[in-house]
């Protein structure tokens, strides 16, 4: 079970009179068709796992909904706390500079809502497993192609 799943499982177990918490997964955004599908699939997974919880996607730029729109959606669904999780591997300027600005703006717009910036994806042993899997996929393809040559 992932760290986010554990956090959401905890949220799932809290009494209904507790603070209503939303999770907003934030990706970069792209003009390329289907470029945002991975993030949307992750959000869809968690929406199905916890259908009574608020789980939404938003994008830093280009793609809708924007981060302010995502915060608005969460508040519109009754969120009293919003945990913003950056769907970014690296702690570059978007994570260090841009996202905190959006968090500050969200807090200013909704002073009674607790808007929290969570950690970006960063390094995790499962990332190593995924990279290893991708390397082996390519190597297996090369072996298949080499064996297919006359």
PLM feature spans:
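Active-site-proximal alpha-helix that buttresses catalytic centers in soluble enzyme cores
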Residues: 1-150
């Amino acid at each position: 079970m992932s760290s986010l799943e554990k956090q959401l499982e905890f949220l799932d177990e809290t009494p209904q009179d507790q603070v209503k918490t939303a999770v907003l997964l934030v990706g970069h955004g792209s003009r390329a068709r289907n470029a945002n599908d991975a993030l949307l699939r992750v959000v869809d997974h968690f929406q199905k796992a916890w259908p009574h919880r608020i789980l939404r996607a938003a994008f830093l730029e280009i793609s809708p909904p924007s981060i302010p729109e995502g915060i608005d959606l969460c508040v519109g669904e009754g969120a009293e706390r919003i945990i913003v999780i950056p769907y970014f591997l690296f702690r570059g300027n978007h994570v260090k500079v841009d996202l905190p600005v959006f968090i500050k703006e969200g807090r200013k717009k909704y002073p009674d809502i607790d808007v929290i910036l969570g950690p970006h994806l960063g390094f995790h042993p499962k990332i190593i497993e995924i990279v290893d899997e991708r390397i082996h996929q390519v190597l297996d393809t090369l072996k298949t192609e080499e064996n297919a040559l006359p």
